[in-house]
């Protein structure tokens, strides 16, 4: 969500901070700001809207400094205004903040009683005033921050500077991701390593509760008041490949990158048509013990988990439950022994999923219940990867568009690989079936490429959606979650109200919405549910609805009046959800472009949801 960039160097870092913010734009935001210290003054610029507005203001004001912090804000407390934009100041202190201070109103009341005047509606300004107040009692900035941190309740990351400390940047991680970029004669902080790749590829990943002091030449990290060392990790240069290239939008680029992303993801697990011997080898003992699976995820990742539930139960006979993380953690779930808890997250930092994981681990430990945890994630250095027993990476590369595409399909591929591995370990799937599915996985990128050849057809269909206000997506079996995903994509980026339903539920309510203004998107693979799905299509047409059908070549579904059909290549039934993701992604993309919305950064949304 919000993005932090900060640094301390020997050179002017204003442009570095602005460039860092530009590289964080994909996370979603509504305002941006920067503060630099120069000659014991805080020089600050803040603007509503795009980072480009801030960059123009900085260029005009010509502010500069070798110590500074910058921020993109996604509003949680207070509207998107210049006064609410970060950095916030109090006296000689400037602060940027990601996350939520849950007890900010109580702290604000106390500070107002002391005479502090608030100029914003944010929870962040509380932190600036608290540190300023603590400086009257402490001898240095680090000690003042240490005094304030225990007063803050919530999940947050902080970057703090002070005019009396022109070579010192203090940072705090408590429930919100933060990374230190290690340079030569300069050091930086950010919410995301991608922001710092132009200046360094060496990083230190802060852990929960860490407080760090950065100078030009040193990094000190403290955990629970004790000075500690955290390892410096060098990032593969390929991770920085995050430009749009020849594509108009990141989303379109990432849709077209899916065949290669699937190829990369399966290559880590398959040797020919068999699982590699070293694939998840260290997890085999845990896999042998599991009797149940619980998947925890949010948004698009939740839809991937829904599909995996069908696969777990139908392929290897392991009971599987799937829950939205924000619901799971607050309902006091029963922790069941010998359960594999799977967290799915593109970033590995999704706040609700991470909190659900930690709560589950805490409950299991308190009751001495044996469980295992595993993350499916696209970021090898993320909190979830570090905090689970095992992990399986989706090798999708950076995904910049807010609407997930290649992360989703690689999650599906990774989940299938995981299921094959668990089934093999537990001897609940035949070697012949593993070989068959492995063969189809290798073939999947080719089918995806062939499906992408229908882009022009889908563009023509999208023109019929531009003036619509509502839309239904219908599917059965593993394509019900794809219907949900298609509806999510359309509403995310085109702002058309869309709903996904299991087609069998049509008569239980949604059919009342169907009229000649309601487009209905149907996912119709050639499987054992096709005949029932065709009956649902007839029900829609009988009520005047207009059908947009994605079906495979052997389905027998053909064009007719008010029934538009895109025929895509036939694919193995187990893997059809991966392929059928592409047409709903392309449809949503083209509708959004035709409606003139911001495809890569849709309003009110963030790529990485790091607050609850």
UniProtKB/Swiss-Prot annotation:
<dbReference type="InterPro" id="IPR001347">
    <property type="entry name" value="SIS_dom"/>
</dbReference>
<dbReference type="Pfam" id="PF13522">
    <property type="entry name" value="GATase_6"/>
</dbReference>
<dbReference type="InterPro" id="IPR029055">
    <property type="entry name" value="Ntn_hydrolases_N"/>
</dbReference>
<dbReference type="InterPro" id="IPR017932">
    <property type="entry name" value="GATase_2_dom"/>
</dbReference>
<dbReference type="GO" id="GO:0006047">
    <property type="term" value="P:UDP-N-acetylglucosamine metabolic process"/>
</dbReference>
<dbReference type="InterPro" id="IPR046348">
    <property type="entry name" value="SIS_dom_sf"/>
</dbReference>
<keyword id="KW-0315">Glutamine amidotransferase</keyword>
<dbReference type="InterPro" id="IPR005855">
    <property type="entry name" value="GFAT"/>
</dbReference>
<comment type="subunit">
    <text>Homodimer.</text>
</comment>
<feature type="active site" description="For Fru-6P isomerization activity">
    <location>
        <position position="607"/>
    </location>
</feature>
<dbReference type="InterPro" id="IPR035490">
    <property type="entry name" value="GlmS/FrlB_SIS"/>
</dbReference>
<dbReference type="InterPro" id="IPR035466">
    <property type="entry name" value="GlmS/AgaS_SIS"/>
</dbReference>
<dbReference type="GO" id="GO:0005829">
    <property type="term" value="C:cytosol"/>
</dbReference>
<dbReference type="GO" id="GO:0004360">
    <property type="term" value="F:glutamine-fructose-6-phosphate transaminase (isomerizing) activity"/>
</dbReference>
<dbReference type="GO" id="GO:0006487">
    <property type="term" value="P:protein N-linked glycosylation"/>
</dbReference>
<comment type="function">
    <text>Catalyzes the first step in hexosamine metabolism, converting fructose-6P into glucosamine-6P using glutamine as a nitrogen source.</text>
</comment>
<keyword id="KW-0677">Repeat</keyword>
<feature type="domain" description="SIS 1">
    <location>
        <begin position="283"/>
        <end position="428"/>
    </location>
</feature>
<feature type="domain" description="SIS 2">
    <location>
        <begin position="461"/>
        <end position="602"/>
    </location>
</feature>
<dbReference type="InterPro" id="IPR047084">
    <property type="entry name" value="GFAT_N"/>
</dbReference>
<keyword id="KW-0808">Transferase</keyword>
<protein>
    <recommendedName>
        <fullName>Glutamine--fructose-6-phosphate aminotransferase [isomerizing]</fullName>
        <ecNumber>2.6.1.16</ecNumber>
    </recommendedName>
</protein>
<dbReference type="GO" id="GO:0097367">
    <property type="term" value="F:carbohydrate derivative binding"/>
</dbReference>
<keyword id="KW-0032">Aminotransferase</keyword>
<dbReference type="Pfam" id="PF01380">
    <property type="entry name" value="SIS"/>
</dbReference>
<feature type="active site" description="Nucleophile; for GATase activity">
    <location>
        <position position="2"/>
    </location>
</feature>
<keyword id="KW-0963">Cytoplasm</keyword>
<dbReference type="GO" id="GO:0005975">
    <property type="term" value="P:carbohydrate metabolic process"/>
</dbReference>
<dbReference type="GO" id="GO:0006002">
    <property type="term" value="P:fructose 6-phosphate metabolic process"/>
</dbReference>
<feature type="domain" description="Glutamine amidotransferase type-2">
    <location>
        <begin position="2"/>
        <end position="217"/>
    </location>
</feature>
């Amino acid at each position: 969500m919000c993005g932090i960039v900060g640094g301390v160097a020997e050179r002017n870092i204003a442009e570095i901070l602005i460039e860092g913010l530009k590289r964080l734009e994909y996370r979603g935001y509504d305002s941006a700001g920067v503060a630099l210290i120069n000659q014991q003054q805080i020089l600050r610029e803040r603007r509503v809207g795009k980072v480009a507005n801030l960059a123009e203001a900085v260029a005009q004001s010509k502010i500069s400094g070798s110590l500074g912090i910058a921020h993109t804000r996604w509003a949680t407390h207070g509207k998107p205004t210049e006064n609410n934009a970060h950095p916030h100041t109090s006296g000689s202190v400037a602060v940027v903040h990601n996350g939520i201070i849950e007890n900010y109103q109580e702290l604000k009341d106390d500070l107002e009683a002391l005479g502090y005047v608030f100029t914003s509606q944010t929870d962040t300004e509380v932190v600036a005033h608290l540190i300023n107040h603590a400086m009257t009692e402490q001898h240095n900035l680090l000690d003042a921050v240490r005094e304030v941190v225990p007063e803050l309740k919530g999940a947050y990351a902080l970057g703090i500077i002070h005019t009396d400390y022109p070579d010192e940047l203090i940072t705090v991680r408590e429930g919100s991701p933060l990374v230190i970029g290690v340079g030569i004669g300069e050091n930086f902080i950010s919410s995301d390593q991608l922001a710092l790749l132009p200046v360094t590829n060496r990083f230190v990943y802060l852990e929960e509760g860490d407080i760090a002091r950065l100078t030009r030449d040193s990094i000190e990290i403290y955990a629970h008041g004790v000075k500690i060392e955290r390892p410096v990790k060098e990032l593969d240069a390929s991770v920085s490949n995050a430009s749009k290239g020849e594509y108009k939008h990141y989303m379109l680029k990432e849709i077209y990158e899916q065949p290669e992303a699937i190829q990369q993801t399966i290559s880590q697990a398959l040797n020919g048509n068999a699982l590699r011997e070293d694939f998840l080898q260290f997890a085999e003992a845990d896999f042998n013990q599991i009797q149940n699976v619980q998947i925890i995820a949010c948004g698009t990742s939740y839809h991937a988990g829904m599909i995996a539930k069908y696969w777990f139960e139908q392929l290897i006979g392991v009971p599987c439950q799937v829950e939205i993380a924000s619901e799971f953690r607050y309902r006091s779930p029963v922790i069941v022994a010998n359960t594999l808890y799977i967290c799915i997250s593109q970033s590995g930092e999704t706040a609700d999923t991470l909190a659900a994981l930690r709560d589950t681990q805490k409950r299991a430990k308190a009751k001495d219940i044996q469980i295992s945890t595993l993350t499916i994630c696209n970021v090898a250095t993320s909190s979830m990867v570090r905090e689970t027993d095992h992990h399986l990476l989706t090798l999708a590369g950076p995904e910049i568009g807010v609407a997930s595409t290649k992360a989703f399909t690689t999650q599906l591929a990774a989940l299938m690989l995981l299921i094959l591995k668990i089934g093999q370990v537990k001897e609940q799937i035949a070697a012949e079936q593993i070989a068959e599915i492995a063969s189809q996985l290798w073939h999947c990128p080719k089918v995806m490429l062939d499906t992408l050849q229908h882009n022009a057809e889908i563009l023509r269909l999208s023109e019929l959606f531009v003036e619509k206000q509502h839309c239904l997506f219908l599917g059965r079996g593993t394509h019900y979650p794809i219907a949900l995903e298609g509806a999510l994509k359309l509403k995310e980026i085109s702002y058309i109200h869309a709903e996904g339903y299991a087609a069998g539920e049509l008569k239980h309510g949604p059919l009342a919405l169907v009229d000649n203004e309601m487009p209905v998107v149907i996912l119709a693979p050639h499987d054992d549910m096709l005949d029932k799905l065709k009956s649902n299509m007839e029900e829609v047409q009988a009520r005047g609805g207009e059908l947009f059908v994605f079906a495979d070549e052997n389905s027998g579904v053909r064009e007719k009046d008010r029934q538009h059909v895109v025929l895509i290549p036939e694919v193995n039934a187990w893997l059809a959800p991966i392929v059928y993701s592409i047409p709903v992604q392309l449809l949503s993309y083209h509708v959004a472009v035709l409606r003139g919305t911001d495809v890569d950064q849709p309003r009110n949304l963030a790529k990485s949801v790091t607050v609850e």
